[in-house]
Every structure is written in C-alpha cells, then in structure tokens.
Amino acid sequence: MAAPAREPALRCCIRLARVFLLLVLACEVAGSDEAEAREGAASLAGSCGCGTPQRAGAHGSSAAAQRYSREANAPGLTSGPRPLALTKMVPIPAGVFTMGTDDPQIRQDGEAPARRVTVDGFYMDAYEVSNADFEKFVNSTGYLTEAEKFGDSFVFEGMLSEQVKTHIHQAVAAAPWWLPVKGANWRHPEGPDSSILHRSNHPVLHVSWNDAVAYCTWAGKRLPTEAEWEYSCRGGLQNRLFPWGNKLQPKGQHYANIWQGKFPVSNTGEDGFQGTAPVDAFPPNGYGLYNIVGNVWEWTSDWWTVHHSVEETFNPKGPTSGKDRVKKGGSYMCHKSYCYRYRCAARSQNTPDSSASNLGFRCAADHLPTAD
C-alpha cells in the first residue's frame, strides 16, 4: 500500500537519472572524435570465501606482472577453460604507482594529471559479482534493487527483442541506442521477456551504486576506492594503457570483452561474446583479476571529481561529497570510436541510483571476510 505514495518521488528520480545519463552519453559522443584522433599517439605512448589454492600471479609480484605481459605478447597463446577458484578474493600488495595519465585520451573525464599514489595492501574480488552471487544475497535478505523499485532500467537497443521494442516510445536523444525498458532489472537484463537462466556465471547487471554497497556490506566487504581499483587494474605494470600492456590485441589474441565492429550497428563478436562474458573469461592480469577492463563497468566508492592534485597521496578516497560516483573499466559496449574507456586510467561517472545493462561491480576488503 505504500507504493502509490512513493510513486511520484520515484518518477522524479527516474527523470533525473535519465537526464544525467543523457548528459554523460552526450559527453561520450563529444569525446569520441578526440579519442579517435589520438589513436596513433596512444599506441606510441609506451611499449607495447578463503584459504584457496593460489593462481599464478595472485600475489601480484612484479615478476608475475611481467610474466603476464610477456605471455600476452608471446606467439601461440591459447585460452582454455579456467575453473573458478574456491575463494573470490586475491591479495593485492601494498605499493606505489602512477595514477592517471599525462596523455589523457578523454580530457573532460579528468584522466590527468599523472600523480604518485601509495596504497596499503588489501583484497580484491578476483571476479565481478555474478548473478549467482547476487542471487544468494537477495535470497538471504529479500533485497530489492533500485531498478526493481523504479520499475525500469536502461538497456542497449541491440540486446532487446522486437516485442519489447514495440512498447518503447522514447530514447536518450544523444544516444538513441539506450532505451528505458520497463521490467528490466538484474533478473531480466534485457527486459521482461529475458532471464538469467544459463547466465549464473555472468556479471550481475542493473545494479546501482547503492545496490552494490548493500551487497558488499552483506558480504563483509566494501567497494574499492578509485585508487585501489586502478592500482589493481594495472596488475603490477607501470604506465601501460591496459592491464597486459599497450597493445589491445597482442599477437591477435583477445584479452577483454569489448565491442568489435562498427558501433552501434554491428558487433562481430570476434572475442566470442556480443553481450556479457562469464566472470572468469579471458586470462587474469598480474594480480589474478579477471575482466578488470571490459565486460561491465565497475562501481568504485569515490565521489566524482575532475580536479586532482599532483602531490603524492596515500590511500586517497576522493572527495567527501558529490552527486556522482566514479565507475571504471568500460564494458562490452565500449569501442574506441565511441567510448575509449577500457584503459586503466580511464574513468566515468553516474548517479548513485542509476543502473544499466552494462554496469556491475566487484568488492574489496581490508581483510578476508570470515565465514558465517
């Protein structure tokens, strides 16, 4: 009975979220020409649960990072099935790294300047939170996501059935491939006629920042800071575009789930996926993290700002307040001509109540959570 009284407020929130997304996507389109123009320069920026058995590189040593990079660039690399580990967290060692870049590809995102950052050791989920993980949380708590409360979420048009599209009469003006779909949520990623059947090991979608925090709290974890996330993404390598080096496809091999073809009209799926990939797809980076770029955007704990000090910082946590939260890593929808944000230094933002069909998360922790 309380729902009708809540409905006007929800409609207002939905309108605000849609306006914000429109602005963000407009910025993405505006920045695409610059990103494309800088492609050559980017290529020349540098050379190219608990107690589980540890994967090679899980401790994040420099040797592991260099081995990962060498393997990525070595001939004849093949990718076979990799079983999920018994625990979902790997240790990330304390260290110092260069955060951001002095060669920003999308200036308005605040990628610059490069600055020296020190982080303490912590733990990071090896995988993005999966549908199976999130379902355990929902079954345990009865939690309703914000997309479920609002009654809709944004879905990429290319993933929708014709039946669903016939009921949609609006789109984001600056990016008409984004459609607000009634009934779209984590259980129904492409709308009411879709399901997560056979996708239990894919990343959970349509989770807002608030939803992600709720899950992390339940799991005895937290969201990573932007600095922790970027440090983890780099996997022990310094000043590289991607977790494995500077070449997107070393020796023709795919290391991330991003868009292939002409966005948004044709995705060839050359990497094996046209939508999300399983959370254990593709080789892990030097710290043992899978899909740290591509697949789905990942929330961080930081409030958004584009102003950064060049002074050295220790365990930075971002601004103390704001209206948007930082997300990192890009998604399966990212293409260099449109959204060149699958680089470690790249970043974007969204309101804490926003959700979409390419947005997920992974957790961090200061210590390994104890089992109940």
Swiss-Prot record:
Keywords: Calcium, Copper, Disulfide bond, Endoplasmic reticulum, Glycoprotein, Metal-binding, Oxidoreductase, Signal. Residues 1-31 form the signal peptide. Its EC number is 1.8.3.7. GO terms for biological process: post-translational protein modification; protein oxidation. It is an enzyme of class 1 (oxidoreductase). Gene3D superfamilies: paralog of FGE (formylglycine-generating enzyme) (3.90.1580.10). Ca(2+) 1 binds at residues 257-258, 271, 273. It catalyses: L-cysteinyl-[sulfatase] + 2 a thiol + O2 = an organic disulfide + 3-oxo-L-alanyl-[sulfatase] + hydrogen sulfide + H2O + H(+). Glycans are attached at residue 139. Disruption phenotype: Mice display frequent early mortality, congenital growth retardation, skeletal abnormalities and neurological defects. Defects are caused by absence of all sulfatases activities. Massive glycosaminoglycans accumulation and cell vacuolization are observed in all tissues and are associated with systemic inflammation, apoptosis and neurodegeneration. Residues 339-358 are annotated as: Interaction with sulfatases. Its cofactor is Cu(2+). One of its GO terms (molecular function) is identical protein binding. The catalytic copper is required to activate oxygen and catalyze oxidative C-H activation. Its main location: endoplasmic reticulum. The keyword Cytoplasm does not apply. N-glycosylated. Contains high-mannose-type oligosaccharides. Cu(2+) binds at residues 334, 339. InterPro entries: CTDL_fold, Sulfatase_Mod_Factor_Kinase, SUMF_dom, SUMF_sf. Pathway: Protein modification; sulfatase oxidation. Disulfide bonds join 48-50, 216-363, 233-344. Coiled coil: none annotated. Monomer, homodimer and heterodimer with SUMF2. This is Formylglycine-generating enzyme. It comes from Mus musculus. The lineage of its organism: Eukaryota, Metazoa, Chordata, Craniata, Vertebrata.
